[in-house]
Amino acid sequence: CGIDYYTRAPGYNNESFVIYMFIVHFLIPLFIISFCYGNLLCAVKAAAAAQEESETTQRAEREVTRMVIMMVISYLVSWVPYASVAWYIFSNQGSEFGPVFMTIPAFFAKSSALYNPLIYVLMNKQFRHCM
């Protein structure tokens, strides 16, 4: 299940599909994730500033910051290889690419659903306690 990089028929519009996939399924989610997590970090910092700067507040702020950074990194690790390979193949049409070249990035992209729950379980004591 993936993009058909080999069909070169003019009626298939592969170029517009790759551009659409890159923008709608990679760049826009990356922007939304960055925007939302950035706002979350600002809200946590504002809440911490409003409270007395205790060790507990600072520790909670560090934990949230670490978790947000891990979430963004996991998104990038999962989707940058796939988006890069798709863009590379799009830019080098007519070149031969082996199945491993396309399979490994697809594996990373499709395994992305595992990363967020793992990050929550490994990095959040309250989440672990509730399980």
Swiss-Prot record:
GO terms for molecular function: 11-cis retinal binding; G protein-coupled photoreceptor activity. Pfam families: 7tm_1. The modification N6-(retinylidene)lysine is found at residue 110. It is a multi-pass membrane protein. Glycans are attached at residue 14. SUPFAM superfamilies: Family A G protein-coupled receptor-like (SSF81321). The chain crosses the membrane at residues 17-38, 67-88, 101-122. Residues 1-16, 89-100 are extracellular. Gene3D superfamilies: Rhodopsin 7-helix transmembrane proteins. Phosphorylated on some or all of the serine and threonine residues present in the C-terminal region. Residues 39-66, 123-131 are cytoplasmic. It comes from the Eukaryota. It is found in: Membrane; Cell projection, Cilium, Photoreceptor outer segment. One of its GO terms (cellular component) is membrane. InterPro entries: GPCR_opsins, GPCR_Rhodpsn, GPCR_Rhodpsn_7TM, Retinal_BS, Rhodopsin. Keywords: Cell projection, Chromophore, G-protein coupled receptor, Glycoprotein, Membrane, Phosphoprotein, Photoreceptor protein, Receptor, Retinal protein, Sensory transduction, Transducer, Transmembrane, Transmembrane helix, Vision. GO terms for biological process: absorption of visible light; G protein-coupled opsin signaling pathway; visual perception. Belongs to the G-protein coupled receptor 1 family. Opsin subfamily. Photoreceptor required for image-forming vision at low light intensity. While most salt water fish species use retinal as chromophore, most freshwater fish use 3-dehydroretinal, or a mixture of retinal and 3-dehydroretinal. Light-induced isomerization of 11-cis to all-trans retinal triggers a conformational change that activates signaling via G-proteins. Subsequent receptor phosphorylation mediates displacement of the bound G-protein alpha subunit by arrestin and terminates signaling. This is Rhodopsin.
